[in-house]
Structure formats: C-alpha cells, structure tokens
Amino acid sequence: TTMINNIGENVISPNYVSMAEAATSFASGTGPLARYCDAIGVSGEAAALAEARSGWQDLMSAVQAIEMHPIGPVAENEGFLRHRIHSYASGPLSPCGIDQTAASVDDPGFEITNRSLNQRGVGAIEYLLYEETLQHRCSAGNPVTEVWNDLGETDRKVDRCLAAQLIAEDVAGAATLARDRWSDYLSEFAAESNIGASTQLMTDAFFVLDKLVKDQKLGLPLGINPTCRLITCPDSIESEYSFNSLITVRDNLVAFKRLFSGADGQ
C-alpha cells in the first residue's frame, strides 16, 4: 500500500501537474507560441521562433514523463486522452491532415476537435513549428490545400502558427483534464482493496519502456524491429522535424527510473 501510494501521489501526480502547467503556459495568450505568431513578418521573428521551439521542447519533455505510465483515466477509451496529447504511440502523424488544418484556420466553423488524433497533439505542433519548406504534403488536386503553395511565405507561416495555437489549446485542455482525472482516480488507485490490481497496472506500465521506447522509438527507425520491412525506417522517428528523438528517449529513461524507484528512491 505504501509503495503504490508513494508512486501515485509523489511520482505520477506531479508528472501530470508539470505537464498541465507546461501545456497551459505554452498555449497561453502571452506564451512563447503566441509571441512567435505576433512576431511573424517583423525583425524579431527568428528569435521568437527559437523561443517557441524551446517552449515546445519543454512541453514535450513533460509529456514524455506521463508516457511512461499510460494507466488509469488516460488509458480509457483506447487511450483517447493520452493520444490527444501525443499520438505517436498510436501511429504516425498525418502531415497532409495537419496542412489541411493550417489551410482551414480562417474558415467559419472550423473546429480542431473534429480533426483526427494523428493531426493533433504535440507531434502536430512540432510539424508546424519545425517543417521549413512550408509546402503542403497532400496529393495534387486536394481541394483544401490546392492553393496553399501559391500563398506568400508570411501568409503560410501565419496560418501554420494559428493552427499550432489551436492545437496547443487543445493539448492544454487535454493535459488539464488528465491531471484532474488522475487526481480524482488516485484514491481508487491507492485503496487497499485495489492494491493487487494497481500493482498489476504498474507492472504493465514498466513494459512501456520495452514496447514503446525500445521497440518503437529505437527499433523501428533503426530497422531492428521486424515490423520495419526495409533496412531502416526513418519515417518512424518520433520527432522527425525537430531531431528531438534521442532527447525524448532520455526523458523516458529519467521518468522510468523515478517511477521504478519511487519518490526519493522509496
């Protein structure tokens, strides 16, 4: 009971709090993403973009901690809440879908919540902040993006940034909900009558290091995982555009060690 309560209250709960704070700060009207959007087309644009990217990296680091314990409320409905925050574990991004979001941000009635999960989350924000060609990734003749490449560079940057803001707000809402729902669930998780089930959940969570980190994040891109049918599968890299993938693996390992050891190694 002491071990489960220690992990739930002193490791998992702070992870959710940190992620919610990072997501809310990043998405706020005075946060680094908003400042970048305001700076597009003026002399401070490059510095503001660097600041927005740094803010995204901080958010991604916080997300990687909660990726190590996909249990409880975030696992419900096939992990919908988890994948709303970061969809990598459920499959690859849809760059074309993200481009369609950027091309549609000015449309009346556009709702980011109507987009698929592989077009949302921190991975989609990464694409919008780091993909530098500004060319859409859809097939020729796609009605949503057919005029996108003809727009001016500044217009495309602005629309991408507006799309990133919509997605960041959605991530912040999901992160806050995940924090609150874990807080509500904690008493059930740590209840003496549920210790057996909660211990099994933690055991299952430990295998995330093997399945998500070793097999998917490293094994697939390197061609070690038999699911990769080629010599290597670089399209399976978690952070293809920011080159942040090894940093996220490090963050996973740090979070796993704390989860395994408990707060203060207890």
List the model feature ranges, each with a label:
Residues 1-266:
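Mature extracytoplasmic or organellar-lumen-exposed domains after removal of signal/transit peptides
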